[in-house]
């Protein structure tokens, strides 16, 4: 398969150097409180990279980032990427227990976090996540919950003895010389692992998906053409990125914008009123995100009062529009059950249950392979991830059309729940519920929902039906589960109420059908 010629070495560092040289004065990332140009991003991330090198961080070192969307996230991501470190971004939606699990599964050596963001005191949060942390002091820490973790850097000031306080000043103390950084960057190659993203899967533990520099740069190359297509004539492309930077959609935005002079508008928390204000102030020309945000923006009372003439795609098109990038500059009008987009340098196959290809227009499971996909899963051997012919079986139910470049998403072959664009593993939620003293056993299923795609529903056999309190259980499990994973509906049953397969295992499909048909009532 022929790989596209990007005009530069496909690494994040090389792309940044080129961007700073060719359009350095253009805004790269703009928030409601801060902004950086491409040139500023290059200069400031270089200083941070030199500081990382001075502290022993280098190629392959696993660096965790625990920041919301913003310029700080981008600067640390660039700094670590430039020296070949493996960036492990963590969801700011995580509960303390989830962060501890991510640090352990990801073998993270260095964690970088702000002192406070989105009303969260991260020092307190980290001490809750890692109970042994508070007793640590000095430059090297050791906690049983995350055995590889040796350093935690905090920006914005901290009084914790276990933390190393860092800032974004131009001080050249505590850094290696510039020529060392240049020599290090020359050794970073497209094949090097660049990022590991933890995503919910069919197992209780999240999977660490590893992508290389080359894959990220090639897969994101289409973004500039697509987003430029939404900008009115004469206006620079400035689009609202409503995807979290700690997930693959957001990472493709920050990498894709390095290809041409695009400006990313983003918020630490994407609230529709604040998004409308930012779009108006910055003359935003498009939106890249899930359709639920677009719908909420259109329904917001400030929508009619904002001057959004620079963003005709939001003003003129239907309420369920989501501007999703697809190759060939094709904007796609889509609902929650459709997804525009193809894959660069990737073979795509849609197959039936026997593995045979299905004709265009027919639903099947999506298989992908080639140089455009992930390197693999963390701590998994290749044969555990790919089949003998190199295909990755995604578990996504899709269809394609002869005259369309996109892939249309229908649902999941697996039990994975997709709610408001996020994946939820039923087994992960069940493992937390089943540890709760009020729960004898549980089943978690996804039930169709018009706004979210699917709603997380817990079917619980309580330890004591007379005292079971779903509201209290919801509060209790938030230490170990992100808010979007906490069930929104609770159904209390007896063990005899659960439909079973001939094997004696619960029949999840039949259970879901009964809930959707109203044959099993909600209860607390």
Regions found by a protein language model. Name each.
Residues 4, 8, 17, 27-78, ...:
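Conserved AMP-binding/adenylate-forming core of the ANL superfamily
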Residues 217-238, 246-286, 300:
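Conserved AMP-binding/adenylation subdomain of ANL enzymes
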Residues 150, 482-503:
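AMP-binding/adenylate-forming catalytic domain of the ANL superfamily
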Residues 37-39, 185-187, 194-221:
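Conserved AMP-binding A3 loop
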Residues 50, 94-103, 111-113, 287, ...:
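AMP-binding/adenylate-forming catalytic core of the ANL superfamily
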Residues 24, 145-146, 160-198, 204-205, ...:
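Conserved pre-ATP/AMP-binding loop-to-beta segment of ANL
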Residues 55, 86-168, 299-304, 464-466:
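Structural core segment of the AMP-binding/adenylate-forming
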Residues 192, 262, 312, 320-406, ...:
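Conserved AMP-binding/adenylate-forming
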């Amino acid at each position: 398969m022929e790989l596209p010629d990007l005009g530069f070495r496909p690494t994040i560092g090389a792309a940044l150097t080129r961007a700073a040289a060719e359009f350095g004065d253009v805004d790269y990332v703009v928030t409601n409180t801060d902004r950086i140009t491409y040139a500023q991003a290059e200069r400031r991330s270089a200083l941070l990279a030199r500081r990382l090198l001075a502290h022993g961080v280098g190629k392959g070192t696993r660096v965790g980032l625990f920041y919301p969307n913003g310029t700080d996230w981008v600067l640390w991501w660039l700094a670590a990427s430039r020296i070949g470190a493996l960036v492990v971004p963590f969801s700011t939606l995580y509960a303390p227990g989830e962060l501890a699990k991510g640090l352990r599964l990801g073998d993270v050596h260095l964690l970088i976090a702000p002192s406070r963001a989105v009303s969260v005191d991260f020092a307190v949060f980290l001490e809750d996540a890692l109970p042994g942390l508070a007793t640590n002091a000095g430059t090297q820490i050791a906690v049983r919950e995350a055995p590889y973790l040796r350093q935690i850097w905090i920006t914005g000031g901290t009084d914790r003895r276990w933390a190393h306080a860092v800032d974004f000043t131009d001080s050249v103390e505590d850094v290696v010389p510039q020529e060392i950084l240049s020599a290090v960057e020359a050794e970073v190659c497209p094949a090097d692992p660049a990022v590991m993203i933890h995503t919910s899967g069919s197992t209780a533990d999240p999977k660490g998906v590893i992508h290389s520099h080359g894959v990220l740069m090639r897969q994101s190359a289409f973004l500039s053409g697509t987003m430029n297509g939404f900008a009115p004539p004469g206006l620079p492309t400035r689009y609202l990125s409503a995807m979290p930077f700690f997930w693959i959609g957001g990472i493709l935005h920050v990498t894709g914008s390095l290809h041409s002079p695009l400006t990313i508008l983003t918020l630490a928390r994407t609230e529709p009123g604040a998004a409308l204000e930012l779009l108006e102030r910055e003359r935003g020309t498009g939106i890249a995100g899930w359709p639920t945000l677009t719908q909420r923006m259109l329904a917001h009372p400030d929508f009619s009062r904002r001057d959004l003439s620079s963003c005709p795609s939001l003003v003129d098109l239907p309420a369920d529009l989501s501007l999703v990038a697809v190759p060939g500059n094709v904007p796609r009008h889509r609902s929650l059950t459709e997804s525009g987009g193809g894959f660069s340098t990737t073979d795509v196959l849609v197959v039936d249950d026997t593995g045979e290809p299905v004709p265009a227009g027919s639903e099947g499971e999506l298989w992908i392979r080639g140089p455009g996909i992930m390197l693999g899963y963390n701590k998994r051997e290749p044969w555990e991830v790919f089949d003998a012919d190199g295909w990755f079986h995604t578990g996504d139910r899709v269809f394609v059309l002869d005259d369309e470049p996109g892939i249309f998403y229908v649902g999941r072959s697996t039990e994975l729940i997709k709610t408001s664009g996020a994946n939820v593993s039923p087994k992960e939620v069940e493992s937390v519920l089943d540890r709760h003293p009020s729960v004898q056993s549980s089943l978690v299923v996804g039930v169709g929902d018009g706004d979210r795609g699917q709603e997380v529903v817990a079917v619980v056999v309580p330890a004591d039906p007379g005292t079971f309190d779903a509201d209290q259980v919801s509060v209790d499990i938030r230490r170990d589960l992100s808010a979007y994973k906490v069930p929104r509906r609770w159904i209390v049953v007896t063990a005899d109420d659960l439909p079973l397969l001939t094997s004696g295992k619960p029949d999840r499909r039949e259970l879901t059908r009964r809930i959707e048909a109203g044959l099993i009532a909600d209860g607390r």
